[in-house]
Amino acid sequence: MNKISNKKIYGVVICYNSEHVIKDLYNRIDQEMFDKIYFFDDNSRDNSFEVAKGFDWHVIKNQTNLGHGGNLKKAIKTAFLDGADYVLEIHADNQYNPNLIYEAKNFIEQDYALITGSRFVNKNPYIEEGMPFLRYFSNKVMSNFTKKLLSIQLT
């Protein structure tokens, strides 16, 4: 059982060609906050799959590259079919801090159906985390477009 809640919390690591950061990611994750962690390698061309097998994760390699969205859908479906109450997406490239799940504890206890976070609320990841400018810029443009289109607050 995880140390956050009596709900089953599974992590799903989404990976493509990330062998050079997997060990750092593993060391960064507080393993006790999850009941289970799946690692989904999206048919990487490097040794990501082999590196991930060295850790206490359930490692799955796609036979074809599904793209980020397809890999994520497969991972979430697998986790829920395996009994997860909540699933946390973890990017293998370390661009998101997986330990921020502690911030969601109260929402988990209140049985929220969806909990989402933003890395843009209190900081600028382009400056503070070395996010590529094009990625940062496109995220901001799409968020602003979605805010206008749906009349909702996004960061």
PLM regions with names:
Residues 41-49, 94:
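A conserved acidic beta->alpha catalytic loop
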Residues 26, 34-43, 60:
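Short beta-strand/loop segment that forms part of the nucleotide-sugar
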Residues 63-81, 86, 98-155:
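Acceptor/aglycone-binding surface of glycosyltransferases and processive sugar-polymer synthases
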Residues 20-23, 46-54:
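Acidic helix N-cap motif at the loop->helix transition within catalytic regions
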Residues 8-10:
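Cell-envelope/extracellular polymer assembly enzymes that use nucleotide-activated donors
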Residues 17-31:
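Short, well-formed alpha-helical segments that are part of the catalytic scaffolds
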Residues 33, 55-56:
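Short, structured coil segments at secondary-structure junctions
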